[in-house]
Structures are given as C-alpha cells and as structure tokens.
Amino acid sequence: MGLWGQSVPTASSARAGRYPGARTASGTRPWLLDPKILKFVVFIVAVLLPVRVDSATIPRQDEVPQQTVAPQQQRRSLKEEECPAGSHRSEYTGACNPCTEGVDYTIASNNLPSCLLCTVCKSGQTNKSSCTTTRDTVCQCEKGSFQDKNSPEMCRTCRTGCPRGMVKVSNCTPRSDIKCKNESAASSTGKTPAAEETVTTILGMLASPYHYLIIIVVLVIILAVVVVGFSCRKKFISYLKGICSGGGGGPERVHRVLFRRRSCPSRVPGAEDNARNETLSNRYLQPTQVSEQEIQGQELAELTGVTVELPEEPQRLLEQAEAEGCQRRRLLVPVNDADSADISTLLDASATLEEGHAKETIQDQLVGSEKLFYEEDEAGSATSCL
C-alpha cells in the first residue's frame, strides 16, 4: 500500500536524471558550482594559450635573421670588390666611376661615394707637382721661405743671417729655416766659422731689385774711369816727353833734328857729293818746328825704339843720297874746339848700355841749345861740333 503512494518516475524524468545539468530537488546544478572544476578549466586554458602563441611566432623569428644577414653579406661582397685608386663607387648604380684629372682624386682602393677634391696651392707657394686622379697636388714654399710644423698654414720668410757669435751650418729649405750654431761649437767640430761681415747671405742681398741697379751703375762708373784714365795717360806721356826733350812742354819750343845712320860701301865723294852733303847738313841744322801731332808721333816712336821721319824734303834727299851709295856719319864736335872725347865717350856709353833713346835725346838737346853742331869730314863722315 505504501508503494502505491509513491509517484512512479516517468520516462522523461528518467532521461533527465541521466544527463548533466539535471536539476536536483532543490532546482540547482551542483557541477557548475564545484570550485575544483573551475580551477581545472582555468589551468587548462592558461597552459594551452601560451603554447599556441609560441607556435605562431616561431616562423616569424626564423624569418628575421634571414632578412638581417643579407645586408651584411652585401657589405662583405662590396668590400671584397672595392673600386681601384683613381675612381669611386656610385651610390646609385654601384659601379666604379673614374675621377677627373686635375679636379679630384683617390689614392687607394675605396668605396667612397665621390672622389676627393685636389688641393690648390696658397699664396707664397709654388706647384711642385700637379694633381692627378691618383695623387693630390704637392705644394712647397717659394725660394727664401719655409713651412714647418709650427706654421703649417702659411710660409714664413727665412732669416738672412745668424745672430752675433753664431755661424750658419745649413741653408734655408722649403721645410726649414737656416740653422745656426755657436762659433765655439762650430770651431770645435772643425768647421771654419764665417766672418761677421759675411753673415748676410746672397739671397738677402738679391731680395731687393735695387741691388741690380747699383751693380750696373758701379760698372758704368768703372768703365768711364778706365777710358778717361787711358786718354789722360797719353796726354801726360806727351807732356813729360816734351819736358825731357827740353821744350818745356810747349810744342812751339820743341825742335827736332832727325838723322839716319845708313851703312853703305865707303867711298871718297867727289866735288858734287861734297856739295850735296853740305846742302843736307845745312838743312838738318835748321830748326824745324813741327806740329803737335808730329811731335806726339815721334815721341811714341821713340818709346818703341823706332826712328820717326818727316815725309818731306829731308826724306826725299836722304833717299836720293842712299841711291848713290854714300855713307854719312855725324859726329858731335864742340863749338869752342874743346875736347869732344868726353861727350863722345858719354854718348857711346849710353849706346852700349842700350840707352839709344837717351843718346838721341842728349844729341837733340845739345844741338838745339847750339852747343854742338854736326860736321862732315872729307872721308864722308859728319861731325857735330860744340
């Protein structure tokens, strides 16, 4: 009886009791509220989610190194294939472009985007070598200046000499100034010290253009002095010769008696020869005033030992006498019949001592002062008497 009082479960209710989520008598779902189940679900989600994220990022990490390795390999290949000296690598095409002669250059293999510009020499510098595609311009200081590490930007003028008590041991170069050393140290090393007056170098003397003008003026003055001195020397010699000949230097007081000595076969002249000899003697005894030009010519001839003759009547008569083969010799005889041995001995001694010029001068002086005269004897010899 009691069994009939209980309700029999139906089929629907039986199916509901088999599935989860079936409600209990109180109407709740006990498995959703269980904290153990919730923890388990959270743990599973927390573990599986990072694993999927890591698996998704692994291919991307593999791709990044591949992208970064490519530029490094490219740089390595470019370094191995550098452009040669005298060219550069184009940043657009990557090809090697040559530099321009005289404009830019490169001195070694490179991958520069452009060539280096050539250096332009500054003021005070000279171009030692021009710029090429593989070499820069080489500049150096002009002569008389230098450039060292203390003045790399400009050339400085070299010193022209050393201070007092020092001597120069090396000249100025484009890279250094003159070098000086103590005089005592230079003498101890065996080098001859320079004098104090010669400290100034030739370079310093020629630095000013006025020195050339001074040298030219000095040469002209020296040449003028030589010319004037040579001209005055001739006149001075002529004046001295006039004084020595007894004329007092004046041409109007200078008298010359020219005579010759000819050697011919001696013979006794006839009456006609005696008359001609007397005529010649009279002509020679007459003082002849000659011009200044003739006197100078005679004096110059006397200096050289040459007999000077007047190309007039005496010359013609002498030539005529020579054609007849006569011999005439003049002797100096005193006018007052004094002994002529002393005078003749003096004249012969002068001739013996090779002073023929002095002998002729003495004869001319004595004849001009009328202390002697020429006399011709019958044997054809002429005697000059005092």
From Swiss-Prot:
CDD domains per UniProt: TNFRSF10
Gene (UniProt): TNFRSF10D
Name of the featured protein: Tumor necrosis factor receptor superfamily member 10D
Keywords tagged on the record: Apoptosis, Disulfide bond, Glycoprotein, Membrane, Receptor, Repeat, Signal, Transmembrane, Transmembrane helix
Sites carrying sugar chains: 127, 182
Function: Receptor for the cytotoxic ligand TRAIL. Contains a truncated death domain and hence is not capable of inducing apoptosis but protects against TRAIL-mediated apoptosis. Reports are contradictory with regards to its ability to induce the NF-kappa-B pathway. According to PubMed:9382840, it cannot but according to PubMed:9430226, it can induce the NF-kappa-B pathway.
Domain Death: 340-366
Membrane-crossing residue ranges in chain numbering: 212-232
S-S bonds: 83-96, 99-115, 118-131, 121-139, 141-155, 158-172, 162-180
Pfam family, one: TNFR_c6
PANTHER family per the UniProt record, alphabetical: TUMOR NECROSIS FACTOR RECEPTOR SUPERFAMILY MEMBER 10B, TUMOR NECROSIS FACTOR RECEPTOR SUPERFAMILY MEMBER 10D
